[in-house]
Regions:
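Intrinsically disordered, low-complexity segments enriched in Gly and acidic/Ser/Thr residues
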Residues: 127-167
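Surface-exposed, polar helix/loop patches in the mature regions of secreted/periplasmic/lumenal proteins
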Residues: 34-93, 100
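Surface loop/turn motifs at the tips and blade-to-blade linkers of beta-strand repeat domains
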Residues: 12-17, 56-62, 99-105, 137-143
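Short beta-strand elements that form the blades of beta-propeller/WD-repeat-like
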Residues: 1-2, 30-36, 42, 70-81, ...
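Short helix-loop boundary/capping segments
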Residues: 103-106, 111-112, 119-135
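Start-of-domain marker
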Residues: 1-31
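Short loop/turn segments that connect beta-strands within beta-propeller blades
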Residues: 5-8, 46-50, 91-95, 130-134
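Repeated scaffold domains used in trafficking and secretory/extracellular systems
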Residues: 18-26, 62-71, 105-115, 142-153
Length: 167
């Protein structure tokens, strides 16, 4: 269940048919992304929490088994396709893949993005990609467990067991 509170009222979105919400991304408040992993579905909401797009990856001609999702630029989302072990930049309006990475050899721990970059955290590496899907950086991972965005800043923290490292 998603709530949006304003001084005047509270707006709620809930989709019981899709089960448990795996992740929500409100980087762009005009296109809020909700990922329901159990049903392999992404819902795009507008700023009033009205459903504007529904992407059911089970019904696409090129089936995708998505394990992680994050916001992209324009009408795209970043998805990690478990079947191919690839990160993909997916255009949800045209229902096509704009970019694909080479297969990732390790288990994926986290995925986050902004308009310019996407970070894919695996057991052994942290990968950074630009908005075209080209790898910019590959850093060995020995202690990072997830990536968190600072609320008031355009920075990310790499979270370890004992501390947070700013990027």
């Amino acid at each position: 269940m998603i709530h949006k509170k304003t001084p005047e009222n509270t707006i709620t979105y809930n989709n019981l048919q899709l089960g448990t919400l795996q992740s929500a991304n409100a980087f762009n408040p005009l296109k809020i992304n909700l990922f329901y992993k159990d049903f392999n579905t992404v819902i795009i909401l507008d700023n009033r929490l009205a459903e504007i797009f529904k992407i059911d990856f089970n019904t696409l001609s090129s089936y995708k088994d998505v394990s992680h999702m994050s916001t992209g630029h324009d009408n795209t989302i970043w998805v990690f396709n478990q079947n191919l072990q690839k990160l993909e930049l997916f255009d949800y309006k045209s229902r096509t893949t704009r970019a694909q990475t080479v297969p990732v050899q390790n288990a994926v721990l986290d995925l986050t993005s902004n308009y310019n970059s996407c970070w894919l955290l695996t057991e052994n590496y942290l990968y950074q990609y630009n908005y075209f899907g080209s790898m910019v950086k590959k850093i060995e991972n020995k202690v990072i467990s997830n990536i968190e965005k600072n609320d008031n800043e355009d920075q990310y923290e790499l979270v370890t067991e004992n501390e947070a490292i700013r990027t």
